[in-house]
Amino acid sequence: MNYEKEPLHISTPVPNGTYEVTVTVTAHEDIVFTILSQSRRFMAQDINLGKGESSDITFNVSVCDYHKNNEDYTNVNGVEIDIMCDGDFTALSAVSPVNIPTVYIAGDSTVTDQPAEYPYNAASTYCGWGQMFPQFFNTGIAVENHA
């Protein structure tokens, strides 16, 4: 799905650790939305909501404040959420610390967190499998990508 609008960005400053995040999205018209976290990691993709409907999306985030990205280091300041949607909606988020296992992944450019320009176009934006990986886990595990 392509998104023309800038994403709604929610930032919650927290120390390093693992957190359960619940994002509640309420549609004011028929919408399709995608939730990304941290460095564009997919947490929920192409969720449909009808006008007046709400959806709670719960996922886990591992916060590590120092990541190497090519030759640069990226400072992550807590839980970072982007909600991509071209329709009219409101969103709330709740962040709570949790004590759960974390899967650490590393690898080459096929794993790494790739940046994207907006408007978002899935056909012309690269994405490592490490960015898609977290959406396939339930709320009992977190994924930390150090590729």
For the regions a protein language model found, what residue spans apply to each?
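Hydrophobic residues positioned within well-ordered beta-strands of beta-sheet architectures
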Residues: I10, V21, I57-F59
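Serine-esterase "nucleophile elbow" of acetyl-processing enzymes
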Residues: I81, C85-H146
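Short, surface-exposed beta-strand/strand-loop-strand elements in extracellular ectodomains
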Residues: I10-S11, V25-D46
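Short beta-strands within extracellular/lumenal beta-sheet-rich domains
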Residues: N2-G17
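Noncatalytic modules at the cell exterior or secretory-pathway interfaces
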Residues: V63-C85
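Beta-strand elements of well-folded, non-transmembrane domains
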Residues: V14-N16, A27-E29, V63
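A short tyrosine-centered beta-strand micro-motif
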Residues: G17-V23
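Solvent-exposed, conformationally flexible loop/turn segments
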Residues: N16, I47-D56, C64
